[in-house]
Amino acid sequence: MARVTVQGAVEKIGNRFDLILTAARRARQLQLHIREPLVPEDNDKPTVIALREIEKGLINNEIMNAQERYDALEKENSELHAVSLLSNQ
């Protein structure tokens, strides 16, 4: 089990409050298996994995926002495709 210090993660995000929000959001993604971890899991809990990813600069709010926008566009495109298939019948 890896130890994580929040100081490195705070430096990447800017302040402790934003770090808490970012880490919680990322941990939720990991816990619900919405996204795969970007660092080895090493039997760690999602909160620790999220902090390690933030500390390494792999995750921040901008990255997560971009991923969510991409997912929303993909979902919208697949729904439009399904509707077009149904309307062609």
Curated annotation (Swiss-Prot):
Gene3D superfamilies: 3.90.940.10. GO terms for cellular component: DNA-directed RNA polymerase complex. It catalyses: RNA(n) + a ribonucleoside 5'-triphosphate = RNA(n+1) + diphosphate. GO terms for molecular function: DNA binding; DNA-directed RNA polymerase activity. It comes from the Bacteria. SMART domains: RNA_pol_Rpb6. GO terms for biological process: DNA-templated transcription. Its EC number is 2.7.7.6. It holds the Pfam family RNA_pol_Rpb6. Coiled coil: none annotated. Keywords: DNA-directed RNA polymerase, Nucleotidyltransferase, Transcription, Transferase. InterPro entries: DNA-dir_RNA_pol_omega, Pol_omega/Rpo6/RPB6, RPB6/omega-like_sf. It is an enzyme of class 2 (transferase). Belongs to the RNA polymerase subunit omega family. HAMAP family: RNApol_bact_RpoZ. The RNAP catalytic core consists of 2 alpha, 1 beta, 1 beta' and 1 omega subunit. When a sigma factor is associated with the core the holoenzyme is formed, which can initiate transcription. Promotes RNA polymerase assembly. Latches the N- and C-terminal regions of the beta' subunit thereby facilitating its interaction with the beta and alpha subunits. This is DNA-directed RNA polymerase subunit omega. It comes from Pasteurella multocida (strain Pm70). The gene is rpoZ.
